UniProtKB/Swiss-Prot annotation:
Function (record text): Transaldolase is important for the balance of metabolites in the pentose-phosphate pathway.
Localisation: Cytoplasm
Enzyme Commission identifier(s): 2.2.1.2
Protein name in UniProt: Transaldolase
UniProt keyword Lipid metabolism present: no
Keywords noted in UniProt: Cytoplasm, Pentose shunt, Schiff base, Transferase
GO biological process: carbohydrate metabolic process; pentose-phosphate shunt
Length: 316
């Protein structure tokens, strides 16, 4: 048995791609996208029909020029998501514009718009996860959206404070970023590349997993942003793991035996009192890595959203 097949016995495998061929090949349960992956898909010649459909939709809907560009961007996000859903049995994660990450109200409105676009084409909201950056504002947005049966994937999660706030707000799923945490420590010369046992990205997910399971939180943990298969295998047993096609291929080609490393405890303890907003902000800001990587992630996803809109601005 190859390692990918073996890993599927311990964790639900999710494809971190918008590439249909890769999704068909590796047969994941779910798939995740982000602004960078959507931009990559739009830039591919094979997806120009989706671009044309989005432009036609935006023009037909009308309105101000800037609104048409935004409508085209939202439309292609959903159309690519629908195409992926044809190939998987589970969820597609579609991301809200990162520039809205500090507005609860704006994030809620955009999430509802995305869900409406899916439902207009016959896709139930119970197959879509709305991706939001794990800011306080978006965590609160996810809490409200869940009341309308809109489930969210809180992404760009780097600090334990973010993880706690998500669990305490009963959000559906979090995506702690293993690789980006690892990258920061490497860039600061604080870590040897060869010593996985002290990989802070892996340690972070293990800590979150143990905490969630100890206190019986229902929020799903989906390890994300991997740099090598060793990070993935170290987290075997994590609820979900979202993996790029390059690493899925490597797992499929390896046959070395793997064991389950993460498993829930046999008993559950009473959880602590939830963090207040002030406590959350203080705790999160004690972690220099998390502060930098969250802001970098929001900023870079925002840049890719602008690049996507620039493509449509030339077509509308």
């Amino acid at each position: 048995m190859n390692q990918l097949s073996a890993l599927k016995q311990f964790s639900i495998i999710v494809a971190d791609t918008s590439d249909i061929k890769s999704i068909c090949k590796y047969q994941p349960e779910d798939a995740t996208t982000n602004p960078s992956l959507i931009l990559q898909a739009v830039s591919s010649n094979t997806n120009q029909n989706f671009v044309d459909q989005a432009v036609q939709y935006a023009k037909k809907k009308g309105g101000l020029y800037k609104d048409q560009i935004i409508n085209a961007s939202d439309k292609i996000l959903v159309d690519l998501g629908i195409e992926i859903l044809k190939k998987i049995p589970g969820y597609i994660s579609s991301e809200v514009d990162a520039r809205l990450s500090f507005s609860t109200e704006a994030s809620i409105l955009k999430a509802k718009k995305i869900i409406d676009l899916y439902e207009e084409q016959g896709i139930s909201r119970n197959r879509v996860l709305i991706k939001l950056a794990a800011t306080w504002e978006c965590i609160k947005a996810a809490e409200e959206l869940k009341k309308d049966s809109i489930l969210c994937n809180l992404t760009l999660l780097f600090s334990f404070a973010q993880a706690r706030a998500c669990a305490e707000s009963n959000v559906f799923l979090i995506s702690p970023f293993v690789g980006r945490i690892y990258d920061w420590y490497i860039s600061q010369n604080l870590l040897s590349k060869s010593f996985l046992g002290k990989d802070p990205g892996v340690i972070s997910v293990c800590k979150i997993y143990e905490y969630y399971k100890k206190y019986g939180y229902k929020t799903i943990i989906m390890g994300a942003s991997f740099r090598n298969i060793q990070q993935i295998l170290y987290l075997s047993g994590c609820d979900r793991l979202t993996i790029s096609p390059v690493l899925l291929k490597e797992l499929e080609s390896n046959t070395a035996k793997i064991d389950r490393n993460l498993a829930p405890p046999s008993f559950i303890s009473v959880p602590p009192v939830a963090l207040s907003e002030e406590e959350f902000r203080w705790e999160h800001n004690q972690d220099a890595m998390a502060v930098q990587k969250l802001s970098d992630g929001i900023r870079n996803f925002g840049k890719d959203q602008l690049r996507l809109e620039k493509i449509f601005s030339k077509k509308i």
